[in-house]
Amino acid sequence: MLCLCSSVHIQAQSVSSSTATSADGNYVEGVVRVKLQREIADRLVAAKLPLSVKGTSKKYVQTGVTPLDRVSQKVKAVSMTRVFPYAGKDEAKHKAAGLDLWYDVHYEASGMKLAQARNLLRSTEGVAYAQRIPVYKPIGGERFLEVSPAAVAKAAKAASTLPFNDPLLNDQWHYNNDGHIPGTKAGADANVFKAWETGVTGSKDVVVAIIDGGFQVDHPDLKDNVWINTAELNGEPGVDDDKDGFVDDIYGYNFVINSSDINAHSHGTHVAGTVGATNNNGIGVCGVAGGSDGKGGVKMMVCQVFDSRASSSAVADFGAAIIYAADRGASIAQCSWGASVADDEDKSVTAAVDYFTKNGGGDKMNGGLCIFASGNNGEEGNYYPGCLDKVVAVGSMAPDGSVAYYSN
């Protein structure tokens, strides 16, 4: 599937995310992600020992499971944390999918390289898989194809009618390219107008998880299409009213700082605007699925995985964000991020994608669909997770119908 990139977007404050990374910048430093075998994971839970040295005199985590304790001593593990947190009412479903088997091992062995720690854990009895964690980055916003204002004006003047009254729809040539702009080719677009003509403008029954930077939930062109957790909205502050393991997640959750505090992000707001800016409300731009009556279309859930306010060592758990979205009825996961992966497939994210594909959509849809950007490096190869078989990967097309120079 191909899409077009445009310089027209909804703008929030400009922020970026940073992480503590390995020397090559591709992996998160000081932590190895492991999947335990079922027997070992159950023994770990049964032991009920603290999986952190914080507040103790211990120099490394002691789990009560001999093979894990041995490798913990070697790498000087200071904590083990579940990748997919306790899920309250959804915990049984998570366990059935094996999500409770995943742990992050944080270590502090002096001079130990990340690959060395991974290999030690990989060879440990009871560890089914061990990997480094890729540093995922948002895709888009930096590279785009320029179209001059004069050319856009010429095209707008030539257009006799438009389906909606949003003032910047004229500028969204990537929705309906009629070839009037010099250097463009008629039909080299995303076929959005044709979809709208068939009545497909965005249903309120469809929940789209924006797994990206947080978006501006009170933006005048987005607010009518924001997903709302009514149990938390009408509940008691500071209480997990719906007993799902998350507190006060009214519009979604911030997986960078593990909080319901959503921070508007330029990339996330841009993506949300493309997906679901309200159509026919006389404001701003149109969203692909923003409805048709000025009252909204699809509902968009905030699953924040980029936030510059966090410390440099804070790393969002992308897989946990995908699982969160599935458990709350999202049928589409919009993911404009990824990473070049060498020898470490992020199987925790693969597990999350599999879970979303099977369980997304709640009781209104038969499963879910994850949509990933193919990447903007202008390269061939496996750009993860867009290279997975179960997802739809979307590249960029130039306005003349050719592959954009920067698209993977």
For each feature predicted by the language model, list its residue ranges.
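Bacterial Sec-dependent N-terminal signal peptides
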Residues: M1-V15
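Inhibitory N-terminal propeptides of secreted protease zymogens
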Residues: Q13-A155
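Structural recognition of the beta-strand scaffold that forms the well-ordered cores
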Residues: V32-K35, S79-R82, Y103-H106, Y129-Q131, ...
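Short, solvent-exposed loop/turn elements at domain surfaces
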Residues: L36, I40-P50, M112-Q116, V217-D224, ...
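Protease zymogen maturation seam
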Residues: K89-D104, R122-V207, F215-D221
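Glycine-centered tight turns that cap/initiate beta-strands
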Residues: S123-G126, D221, N225, G284, ...
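Acidic-leg catalytic submotif of subtilisin-like serine proteases
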Residues: E125-A128, K185-S259, H270-T274, T278, ...
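Substrate-binding/access-modulating region of protease and related hydrolase catalytic domains
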Residues: A190, E197-T198, G202-K204, G213, ...
